[in-house]
């Protein structure tokens, strides 16, 4: 396997270096690139980056043969854009236009790939005979610092502790303010909820009162009707009693009148009899007198 060194700046190395653009590095790996380009000559170095790769040949003839043979080839659904690193394409035209697999192989062989634009054109614009871009910077491991004397270390620790304490206090104050604001909001919400509950209780009480009134009203009406009926019945009874008493009094008065009439008639009869007796007595006296006169005459 070739090395990863593809950033030499000497003219010979630059003229024998091939740039491979629009490469689907999610699918194509370094071993695949070496297998494809090793047939054009010995590969000294190969580096694969995101969207592109570099292949370092021994001489310029092998590099030009690789460019002529592989430029425009489709690998993993993307058309490769290959040229010498020292001689980038000036008039690319529509080099970054996406083309489907159906255009390359016909409508019967349609691959669903999202073609990317030429990473080389977007990221780098090299004039002729310009060194390639530097490789991706590796993470630099910082060297260990020498320990300082105990006093300075203590001061540093104390300073760090003071800074951390200040940060902690500021964060605590911020948290305290946030907590107070949250408490205020919660108290407001609680007050609103309490007022709503009170209003609901009032509404329920009013509804219960109305329901009680609606239930009690027919009973009261019935009681009133029964009382009225009882009073009317008692009045009727009183009227009948009065009528009966009046009729009984009339009968008594009639009987008394009849009795009085009878007494009057009896008194009148007695008076008439007495008068008759009185009339008879003088007649008898006259008769006695007449009889006496007759005797005298004889």
From Swiss-Prot:
Family matches, as InterPro entries: hnRNP_C, Nucleotide-bd_a/b_plait_sf, RBD_domain_sf, RRM_dom, RRM_HNRPC/RALY_subfam
Any one cellular-component term (Gene Ontology): spliceosomal complex
Positions occupied by motif Nuclear localization signal: 142-148
UniProt entry tagged with the keyword RNA-binding: yes
Cross-link named Glycyl lysine isopeptide (Lys-Gly) (interchain with G-Cter in SUMO1), sites: 225
Disulfide bonds, paired cysteine numbers: none
Domain (RRM): residue spans on this chain: 16-87
Biased composition (Low complexity): 162-173
Keyword Ubl conjugation applies: yes
Record-listed N-acetylalanine modification sites: 2
N6-acetyllysine carried by residues: 163
UniProt GO MF annotations: deaminase binding; enzyme inhibitor activity; identical protein binding; mRNA 3'-UTR binding; mRNA binding; N6-methyladenosine-containing RNA reader activity; poly(U) RNA binding; protein domain specific binding
Gene Ontology process terms (BP): 3'-UTR-mediated mRNA stabilization; mRNA splicing, via spliceosome; negative regulation of mRNA modification; negative regulation of telomere maintenance via telomerase
Keyword line: Acetylation, Coiled coil, Isopeptide bond, mRNA processing, mRNA splicing, Nucleus, Phosphoprotein, Ribonucleoprotein, RNA-binding, Spliceosome, Ubl conjugation
Residues in cross-link Glycyl lysine isopeptide (Lys-Gly) (interchain with G-Cter in SUMO2): 8, 50, 89, 94, 163, 209, 222, 225, 236-237, 243
Compositionally biased tracts (Basic and acidic residues): 235-246, 270-279
Acidic residues compositional bias, start-end: 248-269, 280-298
Known function: Binds pre-mRNA and nucleates the assembly of 40S hnRNP particles. Interacts with poly-U tracts in the 3'-UTR or 5'-UTR of mRNA and modulates the stability and the level of translation of bound mRNA molecules. Single HNRNPC tetramers bind 230-240 nucleotides. Trimers of HNRNPC tetramers bind 700 nucleotides. May play a role in the early steps of spliceosome assembly and pre-mRNA splicing.
Subunit composition and interactions: Tetramer composed of 3 copies of isoform C1 and 1 copy of isoform C2. Assembly of 3 tetramers with bound pre-mRNA gives rise to a 19S complex that interacts with HNRNPA2B1 tetramers. Component of the 40S hnRNP particle. Identified in the spliceosome C complex. Interacts with IGF2BP1. Interacts with PPIA/CYPA.
Protein name (database record): Heterogeneous nuclear ribonucleoprotein C
């Amino acid at each position: 396997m070739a090395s990863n060194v593809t950033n030499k700046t000497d003219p010979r190395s630059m003229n024998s270096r091939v740039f491979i653009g629009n490469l689907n590095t999610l699918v194509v790996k370094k071993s695949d690139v070496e297998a494809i380009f090793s047939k054009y000559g010995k590969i000294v170095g190969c580096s694969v980056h995101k969207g592109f790769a570099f292949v370092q040949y021994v001489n310029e003839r092998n590099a030009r043969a690789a460019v002529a043979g592989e430029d425009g080839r489709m690998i993993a659904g993307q058309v490769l854009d290959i040229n010498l690193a020292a001689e980038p394409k000036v008039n690319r035209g529509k080099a970054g236009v996406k083309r489907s697999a159906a255009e390359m192989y016909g409508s019967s062989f349609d691959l669903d790939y999202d073609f990317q634009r030429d990473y080389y054109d977007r990221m780098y614009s090299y004039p002729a005979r310009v060194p390639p871009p530097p490789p991706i910077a590796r993470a630099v491991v910082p060297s260990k610092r020498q320990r300082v004397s105990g006093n300075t270390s203590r001061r540093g620790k104390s300073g760090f502790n003071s800074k951390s304490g200040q940060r902690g206090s500021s964060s605590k104050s911020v948290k305290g303010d946030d907590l107070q604001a949250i408490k205020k909001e919660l108290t407001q919400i609680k007050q609103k909820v309490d007022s709503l509950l009170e209003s609901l209780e009032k509404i329920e009480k009013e509804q219960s009162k109305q329901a009680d009134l609606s239930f009690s009203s027919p009973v009261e009406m019935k009681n009133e009707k029964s009382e009225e009926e009882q009073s009317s019945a008692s009045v009727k009874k009183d009227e009948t009693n009065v009528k009966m008493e009046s009729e009984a009094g009339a009968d008594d008065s009639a009987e008394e009148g009849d009795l009085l009439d009878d007494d009057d008639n009896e008194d009148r009869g007695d008076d008439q009899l007495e008068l008759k007796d009185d009339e008879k007595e003088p007649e008898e006296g006259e008769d006695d007198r007449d009889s006496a006169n007759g005797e005298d005459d004889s």
